[in-house]
Amino acid sequence: MAVSWRSWLANEGVKHLCLLIWLSLNVLLFWKTFLLYNQGPEYYYIHQMLGLGLCLSRASASVLNLNCSLILLPMCRTVLAYLRGSQKVPSRRTRRLLDKSKTLHITCGVTICIFSGVHVAAHLVNALNFSVNYSEDFLELNAARYQNEDPRKLLFTTIPGLTGVCMVVVLFLMVTASTYAIRVSNYDIFWYTHNLFFVFYMLLLLHVSGGLLKYQTNVDTHPPGCISLNQTSSQNMSIPDYVSEHFHGSLPRGFSKLEDRYQKTLVKICLEEPKFQAHFPQTWIWISGPLCLYCAERLYRCIRSNKPVTIISVINHPSDVMELRMIKENFKARPGQYIILHCPSVSALENHPFTLTMCPTETKATFGVHFKVVGDWTERFRDLLLPPSSQDSEILPFIHSRNYPKLYIDGPFGSPFEESLNYEVSLCVAGGIGVTPFASILNTLLDDWKPYKLRRLYFIWVCRDIQSFQWFADLLCVLHNKFWQENRPDFVNIQLYLSQTDGIQKIIGEKYHTLNSRLFIGRPRWKLLFDEIAKCNRGKTVGVFCCGPSSISKTLHSLSNRNNSYGTKFEYNKESFS
């Protein structure tokens, strides 16, 4: 499959450029720090004691400082949402780069794990060398109290050692709970362990306050490796002068040859004993800015979300899909954004993100979400919203006497689908419940499509059975009829694909005549679909938006980079629930 460099640069170029910059920063920081501790005169004596372990531990620490600061930035969701909607970021390419924030977070996390391993291994070697190479001449340098002290004591009786062990434990818990299997099977574990990040950062700030590694402060008056002489005031002395002053008898055997060889060599003389000082901690310089920004945002989000919403109605759709309609004072959101729901009656600490399927407008303040009942949290939430006797009913209208649980929302936050209205042509592909991000887009078009750039929308929905799309079919029919009445039949191209055929004719034939010709059995032929779109939109840029299984996502991503003979460029965007 031939690759279109134009599409590849649009989809991958900026991402790979940022990756290259990030990689260069890590390599440069590692190498510069390694050379400093390997060749720096102020680290001469500590390097003599610890060797390569010193260089590796400090170089890896510098990389950890960088990534521990960067990993917090993608988690500042309110800041990212502001930047996405701000006129200060007019470039669509720059806004699309914000969609890679999750990738940056994961990349920095993996890097932290790798270099934490290097850092720990290097310090284990350092602990051994501190014990074995105990210095009688420079007692200030020693971390051990005596020679051949058990290195394990350094790990469990010093602040850097003890905090380091605790950080390794916390990091291990966070990493193992972040695996895909645990996130899918038990999201609670992932959520609770990931909030240990605050403990990790507090330990990190304590970790660097121990001051075990020390550098020399008087390099000018005590050059590294100098010879300490009594009753001399000369800093530099040639070997013959040194010999004539200190050897009055016959020269040591073989010294004449040594004199000839080093005739011009200068021996550095110490004017005073070396002085050592612990490093001023630099980690806080790296992480204080991002950490303060993140904490300030969390405080702002806490204040913003402290007032519960008013639940207007709860709708129980087929296929275990629930719809929740709410109102909150001064709540504003853009199509494609998502919110985080928090129900204390379900879980005191747990929150879950849900894409808005209905956004508030100037004429109506109602907004809503759809969610599929899968997992412990959604099951408990459903049971609180619907009494057991009413869970089989289709619609529960708002009843004043109904005691809904208190529900808090945080957000809204940005997502890639905000850009779907900013293309002239958009291709939206959904798989199963992945259709929810597009619901708000279609509802917005139903209200008023004229303020937006979008003039043609291809909507593809792949479902397992007919019940999966029943709750969404009414909106599709209304939207289709709207554009037909406005004499714009080509504005929305709807294609629905089902893998099971049971009961299709009965349901479709009776209720959704409009969708008869747009319903297909089997899977889409993606290559033919892309060719058709490219042919109908020659020379244009098409936004491709996908929310669904990874198999569909990978196929669309590959086809978006494929070359076509019509000069059409496909820009790929993806949303993921995991």
Curated annotation (Swiss-Prot):
GO terms for molecular function: heme binding; modified amino acid binding; NAD(P)H oxidase H2O2-forming activity; NADPH oxidase H202-forming activity; protein tyrosine kinase binding; superoxide-generating NAD(P)H oxidase activity; superoxide-generating NADPH oxidase activity. Its EC number is 1.6.3.1. It is an enzyme of class 1 (oxidoreductase). Residues 1-16, 84-104, 176-188, 446-578 are cytoplasmic. Residues 38-62, 126-154, 210-424 are extracellular. EXpressed in brain, in all layers of the cerebellum, in pyramidal cells of the Ammon horn and in Purkinje cells (at protein level). Expressed in osteoclasts, leukocytes, kidney, liver and lung. Induction: Upon brain ischemia it is up-regulated in ischemic tissues and more specially in neocapillaries (at protein level). Up-regulated upon hypoxia. GO terms for cellular component: cell periphery; endoplasmic reticulum; endoplasmic reticulum membrane; focal adhesion; mitochondrion; nucleus; perinuclear region of cytoplasm; plasma membrane. N-glycosylation is required for the function. Residues 304-419 form the FAD-binding FR-type domain. Residues 218-273 are annotated as: E-loop. Residues 248-575 are annotated as: Mediates interaction with TLR4. The chain crosses the membrane at residues 17-37, 63-83, 105-125, 155-175, 189-209, 425-445. Activated by insulin. Inhibited by diphenylene iodonium. Inhibited by plumbagin. Activated by phorbol 12-myristate 13-acetate (PMA). Gene3D superfamilies: Nucleotide-binding domain of ferredoxin-NADP reductase (FNR) module, Translation factors. NADPH oxidase that catalyzes predominantly the reduction of oxygen to H2O2. Can also catalyze to a smaller extent, the reduction of oxygen to superoxide. May function as an oxygen sensor regulating the KCNK3/TASK-1 potassium channel and HIF1A activity. May regulate insulin signaling cascade. May play a role in apoptosis, bone resorption and lipolysaccharide-mediated activation of NFKB. May produce superoxide in the nucleus and play a role in regulating gene expression upon cell stimulation. This is NADPH oxidase 4. The lineage of its organism: Eukaryota, Metazoa, Chordata, Craniata, Vertebrata. The gene is Nox4.
